Amino acid sequence: MIESIRINLILLLAFFICTSCIVPESTHVNPTFHLLTKTIFDQSGTGIGLSVLPENNKTALSQPFYLRQIELPYYLQENRIVSRPDEAKIEFRENDRWGEPLQEGLGRVLGLNLSQFLNSPFYSVYPQRKKIGTPYEINITILRFEKVSQSEVLIEASWEIFNMEFKNGSYPSQNGKLNRLVEITPTDRGPVTTKDEIKSLSDSLGLLSELVSDSVISSSH
């Protein structure tokens, strides 16, 4: 009798040990990380053609510039990608995230775009140090940068251009604002994907870069 009880206890203990080793199937989904990309211009070079610029505006081209730290609202500093279906509501996506801090990604892409528009390969972007003798400093504030519907993203931004060669270099010589909806175009004739959304956000930075470049050129005279 005692031997039978002992065997049953051993079997019961073995059962609990075996069942405790079973790992439930994980429902975790690895997030996808996304990067903004620069605007691709035509093969002739810059987005602003040298031949169409007034003679007194060409002095801004090929000159170094410094892009200061991009200013962002707090909710855009998350690495989770944001949607904002209405003014009072934001949605964070767990499975779609930025592959770099958005502040740095915006600076990287805007710097590349501006370099192409202004035909200026010698530039610096925060957190890099400003190059000695840089005549232009650019301050950009991004207020909105997100998907607002299934078919559109919104960019809202403002900027200031500082011409350090003027006596009043501590004050902006040019400034401007942009508030633009950009259509999300599916790449594969199917439903809109996050990849399409990121492409449209990148395109919106191209629009912003073109306007900022115009301001830089205007500040040169």
Regions found by a protein language model. Give the residues of each.
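Sec-exported extracytoplasmic/periplasmic mature domains
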Residues: 111, 115-119, 213-221
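Bacterial N-terminal signal peptides
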Residues: 8-19
